[in-house]
From Swiss-Prot:
Entry keyword annotation includes Cell membrane: yes
Protein's organism: Vibrio vulnificus (strain YJ016)
SUPFAM superfamilies in the record: Protein kinase-like (PK-like)
Gene3D superfamilies, per database record: Transferase(Phosphotransferase) domain 1 (1.10.510.10)
GO cellular component: plasma membrane
NCBIfam families, per database record: PRK01723.1 (NF002475)
Classification lineage: Bacteria, Pseudomonadati, Pseudomonadota, Gammaproteobacteria, Vibrionales
Catalytic activity: an alpha-Kdo-(2->6)-lipid IVA + ATP = a 4-O-phospho-alpha-Kdo-(2->6)-lipid IVA + ADP + H(+)
Chloroplast in keyword set: no
Gene that this sequence comes from: kdkA
InterPro entries: KDO_kinase, Kinase-like_dom_sf
Active site: 167
GO molecular function: ATP binding; kinase activity; phosphotransferase activity, alcohol group as acceptor
Name this protein carries in UniProt: 3-deoxy-D-manno-octulosonic acid kinase
Main location: membrane
Location in the cell: Cell inner membrane
Protein backbone atom coordinates (compact mmCIF):
# COMPACT_ATOMS: atom_id res chain seq x y z
CA UNK A 1 0.00 0.00 0.00
CA UNK A 2 1.26 3.47 -0.90
CA UNK A 3 1.24 5.87 2.05
CA UNK A 4 2.62 9.31 2.89
CA UNK A 5 3.90 10.84 6.10
CA UNK A 6 4.80 14.43 6.91
CA UNK A 7 7.78 15.44 9.08
CA UNK A 8 7.70 19.24 9.39
CA UNK A 9 8.94 20.56 6.04
CA UNK A 10 9.72 17.06 4.80
CA UNK A 11 7.47 14.38 3.36
CA UNK A 12 7.93 10.68 2.60
CA UNK A 13 5.90 8.66 0.12
CA UNK A 14 6.46 4.93 0.64
CA UNK A 15 5.25 1.42 -0.05
CA UNK A 16 4.33 -0.15 3.29
CA UNK A 17 5.11 -3.61 1.88
CA UNK A 18 8.81 -2.70 2.05
CA UNK A 19 8.94 0.08 4.66
CA UNK A 20 7.16 -0.59 7.95
CA UNK A 21 8.53 2.41 9.88
CA UNK A 22 9.01 5.47 7.65
CA UNK A 23 11.63 7.85 9.00
CA UNK A 24 13.94 10.50 7.61
CA UNK A 25 17.02 8.43 8.48
CA UNK A 26 16.16 6.02 5.66
CA UNK A 27 17.56 8.60 3.24
CA UNK A 28 20.80 9.25 5.14
CA UNK A 29 23.76 7.10 3.98
CA UNK A 30 25.39 7.50 7.41
CA UNK A 31 22.37 5.81 9.00
CA UNK A 32 22.92 2.73 6.85
CA UNK A 33 26.68 2.80 7.37
CA UNK A 34 26.22 2.89 11.14
CA UNK A 35 24.11 -0.27 10.91
CA UNK A 36 26.59 -1.95 8.56
CA UNK A 37 23.80 -2.24 5.98
CA UNK A 38 25.64 -0.64 3.03
CA UNK A 39 26.33 -3.47 0.57
CA UNK A 40 27.85 -1.46 -2.28
CA UNK A 41 27.85 1.80 -4.19
CA UNK A 42 28.03 3.23 -7.69
CA UNK A 43 29.37 6.59 -8.77
CA UNK A 44 27.73 8.73 -11.41
CA UNK A 45 26.20 12.11 -10.77
CA UNK A 46 26.94 11.69 -7.09
CA UNK A 47 27.02 8.34 -5.30
CA UNK A 48 24.22 5.78 -5.32
CA UNK A 49 24.32 3.66 -2.17
CA UNK A 50 23.10 0.06 -2.16
CA UNK A 51 21.55 -0.70 1.20
CA UNK A 52 19.99 -3.79 2.74
CA UNK A 53 16.42 -3.40 3.97
CA UNK A 54 14.74 -6.27 5.87
CA UNK A 55 13.08 -7.73 2.76
CA UNK A 56 14.80 -6.09 -0.21
CA UNK A 57 18.09 -4.56 -1.37
CA UNK A 58 17.63 -0.93 -2.35
CA UNK A 59 19.44 1.78 -4.26
CA UNK A 60 19.52 5.13 -2.43
CA UNK A 61 19.96 8.08 -4.78
CA UNK A 62 20.15 11.80 -4.03
CA UNK A 63 18.88 14.00 -6.85
CA UNK A 64 21.57 16.24 -8.30
CA UNK A 65 21.67 18.60 -11.23
CA UNK A 66 23.99 18.04 -14.17
CA UNK A 67 25.62 20.38 -16.64
CA UNK A 68 26.88 23.89 -16.08
CA UNK A 69 23.86 24.94 -13.99
CA UNK A 70 24.47 21.94 -11.75
CA UNK A 71 27.84 23.37 -10.78
CA UNK A 72 26.07 26.43 -9.41
CA UNK A 73 22.95 24.86 -7.92
CA UNK A 74 23.86 21.25 -7.16
CA UNK A 75 20.74 19.73 -5.65
CA UNK A 76 18.02 22.35 -5.16
CA UNK A 77 14.86 22.42 -7.29
CA UNK A 78 11.94 24.82 -7.54
CA UNK A 79 9.04 23.62 -5.37
CA UNK A 80 5.59 23.53 -6.99
CA UNK A 81 3.89 20.70 -5.13
CA UNK A 82 4.85 17.48 -3.38
CA UNK A 83 3.57 15.36 -6.26
CA UNK A 84 5.70 17.38 -8.71
CA UNK A 85 8.96 16.81 -6.84
CA UNK A 86 11.37 14.67 -8.81
CA UNK A 87 11.43 11.89 -6.24
CA UNK A 88 7.64 11.61 -5.90
CA UNK A 89 7.15 11.82 -9.68
CA UNK A 90 9.67 9.04 -10.33
CA UNK A 91 8.19 6.91 -7.53
CA UNK A 92 4.69 7.06 -9.03
CA UNK A 93 5.95 6.54 -12.58
CA UNK A 94 7.79 3.37 -11.52
CA UNK A 95 4.63 2.17 -9.78
CA UNK A 96 2.56 2.80 -12.92
CA UNK A 97 5.05 0.95 -15.12
CA UNK A 98 5.31 -2.06 -12.80
CA UNK A 99 1.53 -2.35 -12.61
CA UNK A 100 1.50 -2.43 -16.42
CA UNK A 101 4.02 -5.30 -16.47
CA UNK A 102 7.12 -3.34 -17.53
CA UNK A 103 10.39 -4.54 -15.99
CA UNK A 104 11.49 -1.57 -13.89
CA UNK A 105 12.76 -1.38 -10.28
CA UNK A 106 10.19 -1.45 -7.48
CA UNK A 107 9.70 2.00 -5.95
CA UNK A 108 10.29 1.73 -2.21
CA UNK A 109 10.22 5.26 -0.79
CA UNK A 110 10.53 8.84 -2.00
CA UNK A 111 11.63 11.80 0.11
CA UNK A 112 11.49 15.55 -0.39
CA UNK A 113 12.49 18.34 1.99
CA UNK A 114 11.16 21.81 1.33
CA UNK A 115 13.44 24.80 1.93
CA UNK A 116 11.48 27.98 1.23
CA UNK A 117 10.88 28.12 -2.52
CA UNK A 118 13.08 25.10 -3.19
CA UNK A 119 13.42 21.45 -2.22
CA UNK A 120 15.92 18.59 -2.10
CA UNK A 121 14.99 14.99 -2.84
CA UNK A 122 16.04 11.35 -2.56
CA UNK A 123 14.66 8.03 -3.79
CA UNK A 124 14.89 4.46 -2.53
CA UNK A 125 14.20 1.95 -5.28
CA UNK A 126 14.90 -1.73 -5.78
CA UNK A 127 18.41 -2.76 -6.74
CA UNK A 128 18.15 -5.24 -9.60
CA UNK A 129 20.08 -8.31 -8.48
CA UNK A 130 22.84 -9.84 -10.61
CA UNK A 131 22.37 -7.35 -13.43
CA UNK A 132 24.74 -5.35 -15.63
CA UNK A 133 24.08 -2.49 -18.01
CA UNK A 134 24.54 -2.90 -21.74
CA UNK A 135 27.73 -0.83 -21.75
CA UNK A 136 29.41 -3.20 -19.31
CA UNK A 137 28.21 -6.31 -21.13
CA UNK A 138 29.05 -5.11 -24.64
CA UNK A 139 32.59 -4.20 -23.66
CA UNK A 140 33.11 -7.92 -22.99
CA UNK A 141 31.11 -9.61 -25.75
CA UNK A 142 28.33 -9.18 -28.28
CA UNK A 143 24.67 -10.11 -27.74
CA UNK A 144 22.60 -12.44 -29.88
CA UNK A 145 19.60 -11.29 -31.90
CA UNK A 146 17.14 -12.85 -29.44
CA UNK A 147 18.37 -10.61 -26.61
CA UNK A 148 18.18 -7.51 -28.78
CA UNK A 149 14.61 -8.47 -29.68
CA UNK A 150 13.80 -8.79 -25.97
CA UNK A 151 15.20 -5.29 -25.42
CA UNK A 152 12.93 -4.00 -28.18
CA UNK A 153 9.92 -5.75 -26.64
CA UNK A 154 10.57 -4.14 -23.24
CA UNK A 155 10.88 -0.66 -24.76
CA UNK A 156 7.63 -1.25 -26.66
CA UNK A 157 5.88 -2.25 -23.42
CA UNK A 158 7.03 1.02 -21.84
CA UNK A 159 5.81 2.99 -24.85
CA UNK A 160 2.47 1.20 -24.82
CA UNK A 161 1.94 2.56 -21.30
CA UNK A 162 2.66 6.01 -22.77
CA UNK A 163 5.87 6.77 -20.84
CA UNK A 164 8.51 8.93 -22.50
CA UNK A 165 11.97 7.90 -21.26
CA UNK A 166 13.80 11.14 -22.01
CA UNK A 167 17.24 9.62 -21.37
CA UNK A 168 16.96 6.19 -22.97
CA UNK A 169 20.55 5.04 -23.45
CA UNK A 170 22.53 1.85 -23.01
CA UNK A 171 23.57 2.76 -19.46
CA UNK A 172 19.89 2.59 -18.48
CA UNK A 173 19.13 -0.86 -19.86
CA UNK A 174 20.15 -3.86 -17.73
CA UNK A 175 20.25 -7.61 -18.31
CA UNK A 176 20.21 -9.90 -15.28
CA UNK A 177 21.45 -13.46 -14.81
CA UNK A 178 18.14 -14.86 -16.11
CA UNK A 179 18.46 -12.67 -19.24
CA UNK A 180 15.54 -10.52 -18.12
CA UNK A 181 15.63 -7.00 -19.56
CA UNK A 182 15.24 -4.07 -17.16
CA UNK A 183 14.87 -0.34 -17.84
CA UNK A 184 16.04 2.07 -15.13
CA UNK A 185 16.53 5.77 -14.27
CA UNK A 186 13.19 7.48 -14.85
CA UNK A 187 14.18 10.86 -13.43
CA UNK A 188 12.55 13.61 -15.54
CA UNK A 189 10.59 11.03 -17.54
CA UNK A 190 6.83 11.41 -17.85
CA UNK A 191 3.59 10.11 -19.39
CA UNK A 192 2.92 11.53 -22.84
CA UNK A 193 0.18 11.10 -25.42
CA UNK A 194 0.81 10.63 -29.13
CA UNK A 195 3.53 8.73 -30.94
CA UNK A 196 6.17 11.12 -32.32
CA UNK A 197 8.29 11.06 -29.18
CA UNK A 198 8.58 7.25 -29.35
CA UNK A 199 10.81 7.45 -32.42
CA UNK A 200 12.86 10.14 -30.65
CA UNK A 201 13.47 7.65 -27.81
CA UNK A 202 14.66 5.02 -30.29
CA UNK A 203 16.86 7.52 -32.14
CA UNK A 204 18.45 8.56 -28.85
CA UNK A 205 19.13 4.94 -27.99
CA UNK A 206 20.79 4.29 -31.35
CA UNK A 207 23.01 7.35 -30.88
CA UNK A 208 24.03 5.90 -27.52
CA UNK A 209 25.12 2.63 -29.14
CA UNK A 210 27.14 4.53 -31.74
CA UNK A 211 28.69 6.80 -29.12
CA UNK A 212 29.86 3.90 -26.96
CA UNK A 213 31.14 2.02 -30.02
CA UNK A 214 33.52 4.93 -30.62
CA UNK A 215 34.27 5.67 -26.96
CA UNK A 216 34.59 2.15 -25.52
CA UNK A 217 34.80 -0.10 -28.61
CA UNK A 218 31.70 -2.04 -27.60
CA UNK A 219 30.79 -5.17 -29.55
CA UNK A 220 27.88 -3.72 -31.51
CA UNK A 221 26.87 -3.40 -35.16
CA UNK A 222 24.05 -1.65 -37.00
CA UNK A 223 22.35 -5.00 -37.68
CA UNK A 224 21.96 -5.45 -33.93
CA UNK A 225 19.72 -2.41 -33.78
CA UNK A 226 17.57 -3.88 -36.54
CA UNK A 227 17.05 -6.94 -34.33
CA UNK A 228 15.99 -4.61 -31.52
CA UNK A 229 13.50 -2.92 -33.86
CA UNK A 230 12.14 -6.31 -34.88
CA UNK A 231 11.30 -7.01 -31.25
CA UNK A 232 9.86 -3.52 -30.81
CA UNK A 233 7.64 -3.77 -33.88
CA UNK A 234 6.36 -7.20 -32.83
CA UNK A 235 4.46 -5.41 -30.05
CA UNK A 236 2.78 -2.84 -32.30
Amino acid sequence: MIEQQQFGQSRICYDSEWVSSPELALFDPQYWQAQNKVVGSATGRGTTWFVQLPKITAALRHYRRGGLFGKLVKDHYWFRSWSATRSFAEFHLLKQLREAGVNVPRPIAAYAMRKGLFYQADLLSERIANAQDLVTILQKHSLNAELYQKIGVEIAKMHRVGVNHTDLNIHNILIDAQETIWIIDFDKCYPQAGDGWKQENLDRLKRSFNKERVKRSIHWHDKDFQALLTGYESQQ
